[in-house]
Amino acid sequence: MASSEQQIRFEHWANSQSLEAIVAASHGLPEALALVGHIVSISCFWAARVEGTAGNLDPWPTFTAPELETELRQLLDRWLRLSRCTAMDAQVRYVSSDGESRSNLFSEVLQEVLLHGAHHRGQIALVLRMKGFEPPRSTDFIPALRTAAIQKGI
């Protein structure tokens, strides 16, 4: 199994690939930018839960492409820090969106963030293709390993 650091670096790389494809599609395609913004927002939301500081976040914020580049870099640093100081089997206690007290392992939270991002990256690729633009060549894990981008850091 890939290390948590490798998974986090992959998530950053894949999200960055999607954002680059959106930017290359001329005017940035607001619906595709909104999906990247949603990925960022939900990732921030889960990071805040791990940190014990969760509050109300807008799940669909509006960002520009340069703002998203900055947000993605900050998320990479934040999740790398969390993975270094949080055991994979640590309990993350939080209040869910339905107001219920919940608890999940840090490893489960990380998997949620990764799978959520993958889901929306698929939607981004579809939006790009439907609008006549090229999606990223790949945002899959194995091709990412071949680039070495997630091995040595980005």
Language model feature labels by segment:
Residues 5-61, 98-154:
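Short, contiguous alpha-helical
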Residues 54-96:
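Helix-adjacent hinge/juxtasegments
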